[in-house]
């Protein structure tokens, strides 16, 4: 298996480049034909199977790869794969998208801020709503519009968890459906299942509304891997909130913060360090 590193020799961190080369040289595999994630896993110093946060970015866009090189990043190309690996990768790299830079600065900043807000909403909206509806005084408070007014036989927590799994089921079914029917299948399947579940008192309309928002919001962020990381952490927050109430939500949030600050990128450094900056155009890139 062959790999190729592309970098700007005037901007790249030499120590970083040496680490990446050493990690690539240490990989002992006959072939990697299905995914670059196998290379990424082999390059990790510590394999944290319990940590869902992605530590590598992938792109198939030449402009995104070139912009990363200009910022001092390293691009790794692998045989049999159309995507390029971008190293190092920090958390805030997932907040921006290549298309943001094709808009005026004000619009691009607005889109990045909106993406951060969506990140937080998808993570906390269902656990916080669940805790609020468990409050018996909610119907008499200023937040009474959040209360569940329909009759239901399935506990709210079970409804939220069930809907999470149904959304993933529809995604998987759509992927395995011929492209001609995939969009229609997803839409009709969601409508039929949702209507039947409400009429059978399995789900309340409020649960469907919040989960529909979460499902749509997941497509507002550019990283598929980070979307599923937030999904798994949202499930952790739901379970901890159901078990310990607001204390469980606080403990779950603390766990997420600990995971973020202890995550180490493949090429070293800090995961939460923001590397977003504007660079001057580079003169050339060296290929080795």
Language-model-detected regions and their locations in the chain:
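Positions that flank functional sites
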Residues: 39, 84, 185, 212, ...
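Transmembrane alpha-helical segments that form the functional core of multipass membrane systems
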Residues: 90-237
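Hydrophobic alpha-helical transmembrane segments of membrane transport and translocation systems
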Residues: 205-207, 211-279, 283-288
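Residue-identity detector for glycine
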Residues: 26, 72, 108, 189, ...
């Amino acid at each position: 298996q062959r790999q190729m590193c592309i970098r700007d020799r005037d901007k790249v961190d030499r120590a970083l480049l040496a680490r990446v080369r050493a990690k690539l040289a240490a990989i002992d595999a006959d072939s990697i034909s299905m995914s670059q994630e196998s290379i990424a896993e082999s390059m990790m110093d510590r394999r944290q199977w319990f940590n869902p946060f992605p530590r590598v970015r992938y792109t198939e866009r030449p402009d995104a790869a070139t912009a990363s090189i200009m910022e001092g990043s390293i691009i790794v190309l692998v045989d049999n794969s159309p995507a390029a690996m971008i190293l190092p990768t920090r958390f805030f790299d997932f907040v921006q998208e290549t298309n943001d830079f094709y808009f005026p600065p004000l619009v691009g900043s607005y889109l990045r801020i909106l993406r951060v807000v969506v990140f937080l909403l998808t993570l906390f909206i269902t656990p916080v709503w669940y805790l609020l509806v468990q409050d018996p005084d909610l119907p008499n408070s200023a937040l009474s519009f959040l209360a569940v007014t329909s009759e239901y036989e399935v506990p709210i927590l079970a409804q939220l968890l069930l809907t999470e799994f149904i959304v993933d089921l529809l995604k998987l079914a759509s992927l395995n459906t011929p492209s001609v029917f995939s969009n229609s299948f997803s839409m009709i399947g969601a409508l039929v299942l949702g209507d039947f579940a409400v009429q059978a008192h399995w789900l309340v309309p409020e649960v469907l509304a919040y989960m529909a928002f979460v499902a749509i919001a997941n497509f507002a962020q550019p990283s598929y891997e980070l979307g599923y990381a937030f999904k798994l952490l949202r499930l952790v927050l739901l379970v901890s909130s159901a078990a310990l109430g607001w204390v469980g939500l606080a403990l779950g949030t603390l766990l997420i913060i600990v995971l973020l600050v202890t995550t180490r990128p493949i090429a070293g450094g800090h995961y939460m360090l923001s590397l977003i900056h504007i660079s001057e155009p580079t003169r050339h890139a060296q290929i080795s």
